């Protein structure tokens, strides 16, 4: 991981295209960057550890005319972040250059074999092993050579390869790692992310697992896993990169926080009819909900916390066993799956490898699979039995905000749809739940207008090193997402707990200077939360309350983020928006790179 781009064109501007494309995928996170391009004297590789700017400055030393090349931003999985471990990688003879997203599981045994044959390696990566193997097995034909290589390796990968014997050609393939082809006029592209090439084309081919593609400036030839030449559908991407630009905001994150009212309204308008009934008939075709006796919601990170909200909605409204699991653990927890199981997989990018592998496992066990994703044509949406798209639009900041809200809202609507199908929700309650969505939108707008109050709180807590986020019931799910936002862009250790669990050990860590964020949107449990606040205040904690109007929390805390009532199930979503602001402004005050936090990637495509 993380970003791939390739170019073959009639103009000698490959380096410019590659650097521009890598800039567009910086948001995915990386620790080094590099490019390889074909010149009259062969293949030239230039790469640098650190920010892309380092590579750009380095390239100012060269005057390069090249029509074909590949580029990569790397996130270290094998070998520390250095120039030598950055992609692309040569073969020893420098006839091959290769970039790779993924992990080669058996690289150690192949490397040992190549070392015994006298091959000299110049990096510590699993990727270089593939470049060296390709060179060793090369038979004068790119396609047959790559097929021999793929028979030797195990793992997940998206490869892009150039060879000195074919100066105008790239050969690429994918297996459980995203790769697309962009079609232009006398120029064609490959990329891991459509953002990288939107400046040049909106005509996209989404490759499937097992596909191998040969790309020149005028031709794209795709072979499937059975080695048959196939025609993949060309899809037109509707959004352009300008939609993903900052639009006058200081950072993508705050822009995306403040796009949430629009997304709430769009989701309501698209997924309900004029009578305000949820219309998922097309998306959920073929599912008989009367046959479903168990539901799993599986995801990673923020999507998992959105899934916890979805679990709460479904258990409350449907009376069905609903379980959530972290995707990286799902396969190893021996989930009970039958043909009466509905397994829901949530992924913003649709390319999260742990989630994809979990879905594959569930399908093999006989579950009906439903994907909730933000990216049209992504792997998860192609492989699931059914798909509901979130309508968040491109999310660039690594810290997810609007994607979370849209995931929660889709699961809320899904719960209402299922409840109506099963006769579990009375009509008056159903209409109240639907009207709460419009109320949520109005109240997010109001919260946005009051954001400077949250900024003031952030100024007071910016130097705090440790914190706890507490809540009860659905608010405990809010606590988890709030805690994650704070830690991922502020590098503050925070822990989310059910408020009642604090006294079972963790209260030993409460002392002066510790931050506690106490969440209370359910007035039935408000007094218990107030009691927990008093416990931590007595031990010196600085307490920020996050609650709805009518709560007693403001009377006992140091600062408060107070939101308006948006209904029993959606007020917690509004509270999360407040906690997104708190994390954002704290990071701003600390002077950190809000959109690109250290050690994080937007889309995690390795296990």
From Swiss-Prot:
Transmembrane segment boundaries: none
Enzyme kind, highest EC tier: transferase
Segments forming domain SIS: 280-424, 457-597
Gene Ontology, cellular component aspect: cytosol
Entry superkingdom: Bacteria
Entry GO MF terms: carbohydrate derivative binding; glutamine-fructose-6-phosphate transaminase (isomerizing) activity
Keyword check for Repeat: yes
Domain Glutamine amidotransferase type-2 as annotated: residue spans: 2-218
Keywords: Aminotransferase, Cytoplasm, Glutamine amidotransferase, Repeat, Transferase
Catalysis performed (reactions): D-fructose 6-phosphate + L-glutamine = D-glucosamine 6-phosphate + L-glutamate
PROSITE patterns the record matches: GATASE_TYPE_2, SIS
Residue numbers annotated as active site: 2, 602
Pfam families recorded: GATase_6 (PF13522), SIS (PF01380)
Subunit structure: Homodimer.
NCBIfam families xrefs: glmS, PRK00331.1
Name of the protein: Glutamine--fructose-6-phosphate aminotransferase [isomerizing]
Source organism (scientific name): Fusobacterium nucleatum subsp. nucleatum (strain ATCC 25586 / DSM 15643 / BCRC 10681 / CIP 101130 / JCM 8532 / KCTC 2640 / LMG 13131 / VPI 4355)
